[in-house]
Amino acid sequence: RALSVPTDLIGALAKHTTLAHSVWVDARKNNDFQRFLPQFSKVLELRKEEADAIRQDTDLSRYDALLQDYEPDIKSDYIDTIFDTLRPALVDLRAQVLDRPPVQEINGHFPVDNQRALCNEVAATFGYDFSRGRIDTAVHPFCSGSGNDVRITTRFDVNDPLGSIYSTIHEVGHALYEQNIEKEYNFSSIGRGVSMGVHESQSRIMENQLGRSEAFSEWLFKKFLDYFGDIGIEDSASFYKSINSVKNGFIRTESDELQYNLHILLRYRLEKWLIDGHLNADDLEYVLSLIHISEPTRPTP
């Protein structure tokens, strides 16, 4: 599979994905998709070339050819069946929940240093081994590494400490999966996660099933009072409702347990259309406008 992709294409992908990331960081900060579009379009075309090289002499679609790097032996028609089943129920549930009165929200000023200290304590509480990793800051949270060097990142907003806390918990879920692979398998073909789906299940379990549980919310509420003082919420029951509230949002990594799934459903469909040639990169803004998704200018933290 790897040998089917020409060396010059591999080099071009490495070059242009790196360039695209740096441009994306600037475009994201300024809410300027047109700034990012040329690099995005270039990477998209290169990915199509990669898919075509991989799928030679097979019946795979472009999307399915690339999907094998993330979900081995899974094809998009299987994913379609799952998502098509989930979508109506999720949309209906979303409408019901958003129709309810809003819950009390956390309010205040949350210094970055305090958030960072709390994130470190939360990570350690979940079992993250700092002797084999560290937490840094990035525009987009991620986990990287394996074995004895598994690092994670988070990001901070002085107006929204939940973003950093739950990004940290999510990435700790990824990190724990990697840190708990048997040491004898380090640097071998089986010394890594089985698939991205399994990997994401570990991060989402930590973030939602544990991180948004009532028991954990009681502990976290006390920590919030210790680190930040007045947070606009006076009891752990209200705090529990706040960390589980459902509301519209444009950022997948900061979305609630319900909206997150809808982010994935939308991105999956758009991604398939882009890779398989049914949608051009410069049509994305128009398509999103048709479904009333238009992100406002980002506030300065």
Where are these regions (language model features)?
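Single conserved hydrophobic/aromatic residue that forms the stacking wall/gate
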Residues: 291-301
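Glycine- and acidic
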Residues: 100-105, 150-158, 182-189, 250-255, ...
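Contiguous, non-catalytic segments that form substrate-binding/exosite surfaces or channel walls
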Residues: 13-161
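Inter-helical turn/loop segments and adjacent helix faces that build the functional surface
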Residues: 26-34, 73, 93-105, 182-189, ...
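Active-site recognition of the HExxH zinc-binding catalytic motif
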Residues: 166-179, 200-204
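A conserved active-site cap/scaffold subdomain adjacent to cofactor or substrate pockets
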Residues: 191-278
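Secondary-structure capping and boundary motifs in well-ordered enzyme cores
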Residues: 9-12, 39-42, 82, 111, ...
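An N-terminal structural lobe/cap that precedes and organizes the functional/catalytic core
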Residues: 119, 147, 167, 181-191, ...
